[in-house]
């Protein structure tokens, strides 16, 4: 029987976390938990209810009454209550404001509690900004993905084009730099590499190369 370890994958925006995490989870037959989608879902409910992104108290109150859940599929489906928000949470409006919402301490605490519940049985791959440091500090395997700003902007540009979103590469680079600043400097659970995390620079690596590296590391932990 496969040992049910927890794998934490952290890193900045567009470093390839979600794509790699999905591949690793599928290969290991683990459950994938997209914590970024949870923060995007909260940002979306603020947008939908005309709540200012800076209004932490109002968003936290709304979140208490909101169920965020995942359903498996070829593309994992994200629901807010009964509404399928899988596509809308990837909109430019949500993308450009999620770091503001994610910086609110009460929002992070509420979502971290939910994320920890998901992980109680093990056998999960969870990606985000503070998984190895705050959400799953005892995860058996912690990965910290990096890539240059230029490479990440190029990846996000291609993603947007594939989804039919018009985009400006220079503007995307600027937005990623701004998100990095917010993520690294926020007071509550900033983005940082856990002391026991393994750093992987993905700038010159393909998605499969990154996934295979993590799978090799995971197999060592599973078989240890």
Swiss-Prot record:
The enzyme's E.C. designation: 2.7.4.25
Subcellular location: Cytoplasm
Disulfide-bond pairs as recorded: none
GO molecular function, one term: dCMP kinase activity
GO BP: any one term: pyrimidine nucleotide metabolic process
InterPro entries named in the record: Cytidylate_kin, Cytidylate_kinase_dom, P-loop_NTPase
Enzymatic reactions: CMP + ATP = CDP + ADP; dCMP + ATP = dCDP + ADP
Family: Belongs to the cytidylate kinase family. Type 1 subfamily.
Protein name (record): Cytidylate kinase
Annotated source species: Listeria monocytogenes serotype 4b (strain CLIP80459)
Gene: cmk
């Amino acid at each position: 029987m496969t040992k049910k370890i927890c794998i934490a994958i952290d890193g900045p925006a567009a470093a390839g976390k979600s794509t790699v995490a999905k591949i690793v989870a599928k290969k290991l037959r683990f459950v994938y938990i997209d914590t970024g989608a949870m923060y995007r879902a909260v940002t979306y409910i603020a947008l939908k209810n005309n709540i200012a992104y800076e209004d932490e108290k109002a968003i936290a109150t709304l979140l208490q009454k909101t169920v965020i859940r995942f359903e498996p599929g070829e593309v994992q489906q994200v629901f807010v209550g009964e509404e399928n928000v899988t596509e809308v949470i990837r909109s430019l409006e949500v993308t450009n404001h999620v770091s503001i919402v994610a910086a609110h301490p009460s929002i992070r605490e509420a979502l971290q509690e939910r994320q920890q519940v998901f992980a109680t049985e093990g056998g999960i791959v969870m990606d985000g900004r503070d998984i190895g440091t705050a959400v799953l500090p005892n995860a058996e395997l912690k990965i910290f993905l990096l890539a240059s700003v230029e490479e990440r902007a190029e990846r996000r540009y291609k993603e947007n084009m594939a989804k039919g979103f018009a985009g400006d590469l220079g503007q995307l680079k600027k937005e990623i730099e701004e998100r990095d600043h917010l993520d690294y400097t926020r007071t509550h659970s900033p983005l940082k590499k856990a002391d026991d995390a393994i750093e992987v620079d993905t700038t010159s690596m393909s998605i499969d190369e990154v996934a295979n590296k993590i799978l090799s590391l995971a197999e060592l932990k599973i078989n240890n």
